[in-house]
């Protein structure tokens, strides 16, 4: 799910808590939770970054010192492996790195955005692990290609099979293309006026009389 979407974070937080697991968040999410926790008006909206049900994932830094022998490197060098805003989280009591996740995978719900899939190389998800992708369904070629790239990663780690299919569930009133076509076919409407879409060319494939809506336009029903 998007890194700044704290409402979705809350959904996974509650799911992890109710299933007896820790939610593992990344440093950007920890920073956001810290900001909200320090707000007079918003401190109760979301858990604090040091919440007992949360772990903060510390990735490899620029020099990848996190798993190196600190008798050969100083603590100061380890801190300098991370940017200034990241360093304060290195002292949090609830931090974990890839070794903790890899060793105890059943204890965690691990957040891994599309931009941090390289962390899977270290984490090494167990074959058959579950992956939940809480994002908008692709609606253009660029997004479809990106999803195929994501599938390559998860096929590589045995999380999805070679058929490259995953179960889809839609919420908040959204439907996939097959479901929308089913509604259009079943309605047998004389005219179709798509409202909440950027690509009514798909609707024009499915219905002979589609009106394209323009901003501030007036349409007779």
Regions found by a protein language model. Name each.
Residues 1-221:
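Acidic/His-rich, metal-assisted hydrolase cores and their charged scaffolds
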